């Protein structure tokens, strides 16, 4: 397959993201401004809501024609409404009744007003592939080969096999200055560091996408090194980060280090040229609970692939339960940025949402009543999820079951 342009991890938290609409100008009427149509450039799913924006001119009627020029849908535009943010007025053409796959054009007042657009069950398949491939481009600790990365091939950087324990992350089993290994994982959106808290919601997004739509993702070929093995590519990609996350747990007490970073951000250099000392920094309740939630759902979803990942489901379950126990014993440890550390903080001081999410995932994994009771104690009405607000993720997982 072709190599998509790399995107940041943060930009693809939702694999259902819409693309920007593109305008197409039709022939101008005898008087008045030219009409412009803004329509999804990738197309529409057959059963989906389908809208186009019509700007300019006193247009009133629209029709959709197929590739043979036959009119397949007619409609009347409502009055235009003004959107102050853009300073423009537009009317909305509702094309939702169009459900037969094919390629079409939208005409406004009899003039051809749009480039062809598609109605196709696979309209967003390429978008999903590109969004998933973005995670590959953000892999740490590995070279990106031309066969998989095309013009974005690069040497390996940040092996992270000798990471120093910062004083803020020290414990009896891992004193300050000792060294641990935590390779792989994904770089953050704008730097070469790796953070458990926001990495957690990114990994969960991939795992949830697989759980909700296995038939769609089972056949995707992302052109990553693991493509063609017996595991769906979306799970192979998530595993790259799960392996790193497992290394972020302090085996001595079950707590989870908040981040693996330099003391300061790297400059604008390629990964192999960024060679500053790397540190495990901090421990906190949010990191432990996000880790527990991700490991719990991963334990469930990788169980059918035990042959490819021997021992991993049991290991992830044990890791999730250990992190939960640590969080129960340390329920309010907020991450505080040490004075000598100047990378992303990703701090949080309210943990009900993390407790609810982790409890939901552990309940689905184990069926144990203690986790359901914990979910009931901590759950709130779901809001829009983000790295700092993850309560809705537990609701999503529970609703699916």
Regions found by a protein language model. Give the residues of each.
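Contiguous beta-strand segments within globular domains
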Residues: 33-57
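N-terminal secretory signal peptides that target proteins for export/translocation
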Residues: 1-9
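Beta-strand secondary-structure signal
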Residues: 51-53, 92, 105
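Glycan-recognition and catalytic cores of secretory/periplasmic carbohydrate-active enzymes
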Residues: 32-36, 61-90, 99-101, 105-108, ...
């Amino acid at each position: 397959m072709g190599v998509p342009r790399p995107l940041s991890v943060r930009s693809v938290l939702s694999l259902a993201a819409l693309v920007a609409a593109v305008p197409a100008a039709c022939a101008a009427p005898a008087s008045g401004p030219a009409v412009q149509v803004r329509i999804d450039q990738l197309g529409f799913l057959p059963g989906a809501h389908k809208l186009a924006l019509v700007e300019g001119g006193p247009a009133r009627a629209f029709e959709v024609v197929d590739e043979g020029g036959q009119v397949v849908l007619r409609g009347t535009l409502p009055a235009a409404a003004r959107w102050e943010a853009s300073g423009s007025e537009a009317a909305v053409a509702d094309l939702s009744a169009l459900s037969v796959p094919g390629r079409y054009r939208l005409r406004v007042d009899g003039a051809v007003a749009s480039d062809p657009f598609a109605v196709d069950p696979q309209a967003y398949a390429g978008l999903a592939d590109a969004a998933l491939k973005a995670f590959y481009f953000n892999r740490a600790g590995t070279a990106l080969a031309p066969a998989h990365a095309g013009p974005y091939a690069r040497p390996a950087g940040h092996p992270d096999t000798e990471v120093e324990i910062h004083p803020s992350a020290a414990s009896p089993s891992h004193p300050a200055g000792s060294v641990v290994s935590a390779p792989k994982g994904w770089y953050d959106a704008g730097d070469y560091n790796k953070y458990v808290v926001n990495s957690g919601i990114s990994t969960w997004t991939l795992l949830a996408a697989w759980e909700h739509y296995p038939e769609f993702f089972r056949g995707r070929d992302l052109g990553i090194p693991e493509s063609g093995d017996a595991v769906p590519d979306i799970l192979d990609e998530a595993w790259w980060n799960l392996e790193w996350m497992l290394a972020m747990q302090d085996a001595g007490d079950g707590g989870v280090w908040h981040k693996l970073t330099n003391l300061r951000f790297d400059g604008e250099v390629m990964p192999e040229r960024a060679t500053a000392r790397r540190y495990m920094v901090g421990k906190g309740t949010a990191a432990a609970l996000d880790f527990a939630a991700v490991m719990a759902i991963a334990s469930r979803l990788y169980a059918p692939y035990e042959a490819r990942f021997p021992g991993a489901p049991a290991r992830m379950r044990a890791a999730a339960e250990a992190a939960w126990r640590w969080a129960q014993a340390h329920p309010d440890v907020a991450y505080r940025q040490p004075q000598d550390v100047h990378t992303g903080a990703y701090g949080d001081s309210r943990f009900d949402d993390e407790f609810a999410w982790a409890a939901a995932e552990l309940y689905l994994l184990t069926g144990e009543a203690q986790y359901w009771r914990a979910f009931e104690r901590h759950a709130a009405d779901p809001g829009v999820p983000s790295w700092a607000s993850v309560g809705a993720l537990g609701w999503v997982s529970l609703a699916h079951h």
